[in-house]
Amino acid sequence: MRCLSKKHQKQGDEHGGEIPLPNPDEGTIICGVVRHLGGDYLIAKCLDGVDRKIRIPGKLRRKVWITEGDIILVGLWDFSSEKGEVVYKYGKNEVNKLVEKGVVPKEFIDALSELI
């Protein structure tokens, strides 16, 4: 068993080994990053076909680098469905699992790569 620092142990246990999925009741949706606007804002194309202005919260901004083409889980704001904030960034392996499960269509990934 490897001995990991507290920082690395915490990162692995954050979601209990499960990939967080979108939940319409909680107001979350999967989006793909189209471009950075500067600061902590970006434009993302969501699965419902809407382009949204997304904010990267401070706790993620310092830990996770979000670049164009990344697939993210977004929590929509209650008072404005055109805006939201990043909840989770999916890794490449997680995106492949989401495609296998049918949560994200392969066409969405292909269309996102063409936009960039």
Curated annotation (Swiss-Prot):
Pfam families xref list: eIF-1a
Recorded GO MF terms: RNA binding; translation initiation factor activity
Keywords for the protein's UniProt record, in alphabetical order: Initiation factor, Protein biosynthesis
SMART domains recorded: eIF1a
CDD domains: S1_IF1A
PROSITE patterns: S1_IF1_TYPE (PS50832)
Region (Disordered): 1-25
Paired cysteines (S-S): none
InterPro entries: NA-bd_OB-fold, RNA-binding_domain_S1_IF1, TIF_eIF-1A
Residues covered by the S1-like domain: 17-91
Family of the protein in this entry: Belongs to the eIF-1A family.
Role of this protein: Seems to be required for maximal rate of protein biosynthesis. Enhances ribosome dissociation into subunits and stabilizes the binding of the initiator Met-tRNA(I) to 40 S ribosomal subunits.
NCBIfam families found in the cross-reference section: PRK04012.1-1 (NF003082), PRK04012.1-3 (NF003084)
Protein name (database record): Translation initiation factor 1A
Taxonomy of the source species: Archaea, Thermoproteota, Thermoprotei, Desulfurococcales, Desulfurococcaceae
Underlying gene: eIF1A
